[in-house]
């Protein structure tokens, strides 16, 4: 008999089983549609046209009108999408399985179809810098390039806790996941490639594969194969991975992940275009930047010599990069993907071409070397670790680009010892700076180690030794040899264009860009270094060590660059300084720095004061011209009396209105016989008036005429000084236009760009004062000109300093308010004209 307790347990079990079965059946249906919905979203964003995508837009609820009634709408997960292009045959494997624990992982591969290429076309891929890299040639064995690999799997080993009513939660999580997937597929590089390939012969295709079956890589370029060399990538890898948030259920976990290429700029080019680009790159960089069909055939011959240990292997399965390794079914699929090695054997010519292409393109990106010969990277270089001489390695790290490389690998001198290699090196940047002065050059050469420590980007130039040939010397740049004044061997002497006349000194010759003046520059301290004997010609370094190196049989016999630098510094220090007039000193005597600087300052001040003599000459010449013009004009007397007196201001602009640098510095001989004190000069500069006012006409000095002491004559002498002021020329320029003088007497270059100002002859104002003395007027004019001539010739001492200072402080009184405004305006205009000059 069955106990009542047993009946209760059996009845509870029978009641639970139908509910669990129903829940599992619904969950299985959700999992099946999860796979089909993922395929539908990926295919729609990759292979369908834009017009079709517009008709099949994302819709949340509702109906789509105007579409074919026969096509069904997939409304799962609130994404209304048509099932027109859904591959039903490929999806049967996941639709017909009732036991979800046996459901295999699904792989969706998105590839670039190359079957439509012609024989004269080549597909290239551009990297982040725009450099083209060859993918495949039309008619080759490679027909596909894998762009993306999607992995949709159900992991039965990872389950969640028992939830009685979990279907609504799972369904809501799936809705969020598919909406994210829908948007992400349109942000990936392959979607951009799809838009760019609308008018080309390239197409994008998709494949749905069983994750448990091995994937053949024959005739394809796998996702794990980088078309762009790793050292040319800006990222760590050529592809990226994305894992979406998994959805956990009581039966297992739903996962979606993707691995895709980062670069999508595929394009088609004709072989003739690539060939022309190839020759252009040879002319520019002496390197190939494009792959040619000839190189492909050459690489096919080289693949026979490849060692099996150097072949690129897929150590890690392609699918292992996109899903977890703990899935048993996924591990079986990943292990089955090792036949990619056959693809490697079939694609050796392309991979080998890409390797060579990467090195050549890397060389083309560096700056042009200084040597005349092209730099080549030989594949049989001892730096390569490959056992085969015809292969080039894949560089694990990006090489450092040295833009100042001199010479090539094949023409470089053989290495000697570490001591020689470290001691016989010299930075080019010491004398390559043309804009640096000799003082800064000497400062750098006095401390060569500290000055050259900052030049990290320049390359070291080794000095040629006994084993160096003429080829290396000829490839040395001409500019370096001329700037360092080096004595090159035989042909380099002809290359420099001059020879050394003698060898009387062991001081090295540093050639100058001034040409023939270099010999005059160093003639006092050093002689020319003659050409060395032919027996010791190869012992001379490229940087031209001292002539004493000719006596040495080896280039490293104790003579270093520092010795030559010290000789050069001593040669510069022994050069005599520039001596000013009055700064008398013997070249052999040692004068302190303070005494020398003070003497130089005094000499410069004395030279600057010579400008004032030029102003005195200008004033005297202007006065003489006006007197001469007055004598010839014979104009009528003016009705207005002149208000100017002997205390009128000098014909100059006010203090501070112009800079002394605008005044011409003409070496005048007016003060050769005069002894003007320095205090008078400083007083004249402080008062704001030129020092030429100190040398105003002295009426108390010796003269051979007696009428100069009369008031009338004094008025005549002072009138020319006031007649050239801007105020007087502006107020009276319309009264008499017969006399024209361009510019002021003190600064004749101020009004060159302005209109010529007509000055009034102010001597007409003074005709009323001595009209009764008409018989003596002509004699007085002649005597006045004689007086001015004597003044210019003798230049006596000036005794009218107080008179000049007084006249500079008392401006002329015009007597009208409007004249004061015009005075300010004219001085302002004068400042503007000075600023322009």
Swiss-Prot record:
Gene3D superfamilies: 6.10.140.1900, HORMA domain. It is found in: Cytoplasm; Preautophagosomal structure. Residues 450-475, 509-523 have a biased composition (Low complexity). Residues 358-400, 476-486, 524-538, 658-680, 688-704, 796-812 have a biased composition (Polar residues). Residues 302-400, 446-540, 631-704, 793-837 are annotated as: Disordered. Keywords: Autophagy, Cytoplasm, Protein transport, Transport. InterPro entries: ATG13, Atg13_N, HORMA_dom_sf. One of its GO terms (cellular component) is phagophore assembly site. One of its GO terms (biological process) is protein transport. Residues 815-825 have a biased composition (Acidic residues). Residues 302-336 have a biased composition (Basic and acidic residues). PANTHER family: AUTOPHAGY-RELATED PROTEIN 13, PTHR13430. Belongs to the ATG13 family. Fungi subfamily. Activates the ATG1 kinase in a nutritional condition dependent manner through the TOR pathway, leading to autophagy. Also involved in cytoplasm to vacuole transport (Cvt) and more specifically in Cvt vesicle formation. Seems to play a role in the switching machinery regulating the conversion between the Cvt pathway and autophagy. Finally, ATG13 is also required for glycogen storage during stationary phase. Interacts with ATG1 to form the ATG1-ATG13 kinase complex. This is Autophagy-related protein 13. It comes from Debaryomyces hansenii (strain ATCC 36239 / CBS 767 / BCRC 21394 / JCM 1990 / NBRC 0083 / IGC 2968). The gene is ATG13.
